[in-house]
Amino acid sequence: GCNLRCSYCDTAYSLSLTDTAEALTEEELLSRIHAFPWKKITLTGGEPMLHPVRHLCEVLGKEGYEVNIETNGAVALFQERPQGTFYTMDFKCGGSGMKERMLEENFRLLGKEDVLKFVVSSKADMDEMKTIIAAHFHKGEDPAFYVSPVWGRIAPADLVEYVRRERLSDVRVPVQLHKIIWDPQKRGV
């Protein structure tokens, strides 16, 4: 499940997965992971940091896996991260209704191997993103910065124009391709 209730949540079904989730022990999960040839794992959710994932990350890191933890920014990151672990961390701006839940102390734990992602729903959110980057990050070991529009609230072209106009050369604008290929409400893609 997820510990946030963002105004624009596009995966509300993940808030509580009691009817569809399959509970696995760490050993069962490792067995399933080992059945595949890939060495890159993403822990996502809901919110994976609500669960005891540190040991799993340690085991996978020692086995040569890269583990990407997609986290919502409202749960403390590991003070010392396991080998091979990196973060894609959201920062929920004001338009989400969850800004007060964000842990800005997580910023100091992000490095150049990580991603700080903003999902914006208004110009005010875009301005907030710009302010946060300027206040907390100073070139060098900074994470990559991604910004995506809330589907249906901001046109991607307007977001790209904002990034260009404000000269945010470190900010990338990835496209949620699954929302273009399939119906934006389709689950499991």
Enumerate the language-model features and the residues they cover.
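Conserved short-loop catalytic and cofactor-binding motifs
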Residues: 17, 117, 147
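Active-site beta-loop-alpha junctions enriched in small/polar residues
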Residues: 46-48, 72-74, 92-94, 119-121, ...
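Radical SAM/AdoMet-radical enzyme domain recognition
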Residues: 53-134, 139-143
